């Protein structure tokens, strides 16, 4: 399975992880209560979130989009939910631009950067 990375750079010059197959309906997505891996969320107060709660889902999406690998994005990010939450997410400008570009190219949707 091929993956692509955005030309936008994330923290410490890491490319923003946007897997080619992120919107594949066959990919299982995390749901319910999740505990984020240490490489995404490395400090307290909590590593556990309830994805049914909008505020928790926002925090998970922010952290995964900033710190996650392609596999993390595949596992935690539902692109329909991402679209619905996009305006409320606090993301670095390069991450926001990379995902806005993805939505423009793959869904024909213009999102504010």
Model-identified regions with their sequence ranges:
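Long, compositionally biased intrinsically disordered regulatory segments in eukaryotic proteins
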Residues: 1-113
């Amino acid at each position: 399975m091929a993956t692509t990375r955005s030309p936008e750079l994330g923290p410490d010059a890491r490319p923003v992880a946007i897997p080619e197959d992120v919107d594949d309906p066959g990919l299982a997505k995390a749901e319910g209560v999740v505990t984020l891996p240490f490489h995404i969320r490395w400090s307290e107060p909590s590593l556990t979130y309830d994805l049914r709660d909008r505020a928790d889902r926002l925090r998970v999406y922010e952290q995964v989009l900033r710190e996650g690998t392609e596999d993390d994005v595949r596992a935690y990010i539902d692109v329909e939910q991402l679209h619905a939450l996009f305006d409320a997410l606090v993301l670095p400008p390069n991450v926001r631009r990379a995902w806005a570009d993805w939505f423009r190219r793959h869904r024909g949707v213009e999102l504010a950067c």
